[in-house]
Amino acid sequence: VYDKLVETGKRKETILASIEAQDKLTDELKRRIEACWDATELEDIYLPYKPKRRTRAEIARQKGLEPLAVIIAMQREAHIREVAGRYVNGQVKDADEALAGASDILAEQFNENERCRNSVRQQFRRGAVISSKVVKGKEEEGAKYRDYFDFSEPLKRCSSHRLLALRRGEAEGILKVAISPDDEACVESLNRLCVKGNGECSKLVASALTDSYKRLIKPSIETEFAAASKQKADDEAIRVFAQNLHQLLLAPPLGQKRVLGL
């Protein structure tokens, strides 16, 4: 626990320095970061400020499409294609390209939204399934993992020893392991959060949400849960090792023979 707190403290310092260097560190944001000791929540807070590679959303911003994304997000404009036509220029060839770029911006914003990410996390907790398949051609080499060649089980019911076996099989290149929630339930929960009606803008928001979920949010949250399951398996391995070592150290040194002293 102490090591985790130290690690989180160092991470907070790095995050504060990064945001301050961008001249985006407000007093409220600083207080929030300083008060946060949950590593996952801390990364969610930092995500909108995290330096990005050249993403689809960043390309769209450079084309001047962020104001269009704002209009779509408000979900009030009834003639959005007509509005999108105003953004056609040397970099944007038509209204469809303008709407696609604005949707890319929205998808990235949804991925950086804590409520959206927590909504998907909740669905992972409720119904994620951990599954494994044997890597083609590894059947004979990985015979000891035969029980996991075509395996699936709700993650919340998967025991530590199964997690340990799955992660060992994955590390040895025998198994492909995946953690997946109910995709439909995840998208529905996001729609409940963000979609405000059934107009054209709302349809674009719903489409951007689906794209954000499949392309950005789901892979990110799956990585989180994979790391958590690995930690659970590692903790179990340490516990079993400690238990076995304890029994070994307490065992009579000469078996059934009586010992007066050593």
Descriptions of predicted regions:
Residues 4, 8-253, 258-262:
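Duplex nucleic acid-engaging cores and interfaces of nucleic-acid transaction enzymes
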Residues 1:
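Catalytic phosphate-handling regions of large nucleic-acid enzymes and associated NTPases
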